[in-house]
Swiss-Prot record:
Keywords: Chaperone, Cytoplasm, Stress response
Biased composition (Basic and acidic residues): 1-10
Biased composition (Acidic residues): 11-29
Function: Participates actively in the response to hyperosmotic and heat shock by preventing the aggregation of stress-denatured proteins, in association with DnaK and GrpE. It is the nucleotide exchange factor for DnaK and may function as a thermosensor. Unfolded proteins bind initially to DnaJ; upon interaction with the DnaJ-bound protein, DnaK hydrolyzes its bound ATP, resulting in the formation of a stable complex. GrpE releases ADP from DnaK; ATP binding to DnaK triggers the release of the substrate protein, thus completing the reaction cycle.
Species of the source: Clostridium acetobutylicum (strain ATCC 824 / DSM 792 / JCM 1419 / IAM 19013 / LMG 5710 / NBRC 13948 / NRRL B-527 / VKM B-1787 / 2291 / W)
Family annotation (CDD domains): GrpE (cd00446)
Region feature (Disordered): 1-57
Lineage: Bacteria, Bacillati, Bacillota, Clostridia, Eubacteriales
MF annotations from Gene Ontology: adenyl-nucleotide exchange factor activity; protein homodimerization activity; protein-folding chaperone binding; unfolded protein binding
Annotated family: Belongs to the GrpE family.
Stated name of the protein: Protein GrpE
Cellular compartment(s): Cytoplasm
Length: 200
């Protein structure tokens, strides 16, 4: 019986040893999993810190780019406003200069008309004075590049304005018969169309 007991004890001891080994293995695996968790936690904390630093750097970089873009936009806006103001002043200056040139050319004609109106003389003298003023005025227009639109020949709707139509076999179709009011142009720009009578 004692042998049986010693075998039993041995078996019991073996079972106890085995269970203790299992407990140790479980304890070791728990410890190793805790260590792994701790290591993983440290790694993930490091990763988060690195990621956080990267995001902060990227955020700072984007903020700087945005500030630079805002600055460029403000400068461009100011430059555009200056350009608009400058061109408006230049345009006004050009218009004023053009008006001055025209007026300076016309003033002598006005002076002569006033002199003619204030003088006493015969109708022939007055007529002669008016003809001289007309000639002076045409010279002034010529200096400004303004010329009379020729009205002979065919009717041209780009240059003429037909205010009357007549039936006359002595003229060809759409031929200008008479100029009722002269037209003028400067270069290719028509300042005033000629008012004409046209044959049908």
């Amino acid at each position: 019986m004692q042998e049986k007991d010693s075998k039993d004890v041995t078996m019991e001891d073996e079972e106890t040893i085995a269970s203790q080994e299992e407990i140790e293995v479980e304890g070791n695996s728990e410890e190793s999993s805790k260590e792994e968790e701790s290591n993983n936690s440290e790694i993930s904390d490091e990763n988060l810190s690195e990621e956080n630093l990267k995001l902060k750097d990227e955020n700072e970089k984007l903020k700087n780019e945005l500030d630079a873009a805002k600055d460029r936009l403000l400068r461009l806006s100011a430059e555009y406003e200056n350009y608009r103001n400058r061109t408006a002043k230049e345009k006004e200056g050009i218009y004023t200069d053009a008006c001055s040139d025209v007026i300076n050319e016309m003033l002598p004609t006005l002076d002569n008309l006033e002199r003619a109106a204030s003088t006493e003389g015969s109708a022939e003298d007055i007529k002669k004075g008016v003809e001289m003023v007309v000639k002076q005025f045409k010279n002034s227009l010529s200096k400004l590049g303004i010329e009379e639109i020729p009205s002979e020949g065919k009717f041209d709707p780009n240059l003429h304005n037909a205010v009357m139509h007549i039936e006359d076999e002595g003229y060809g179709e759409n031929e200008v018969v008479e100029v009722l009011q002269k037209g003028y142009k400067r270069g290719d720009k028509v300042l005033r169309h000629s008012m004409v009578k046209v044959a049908n």
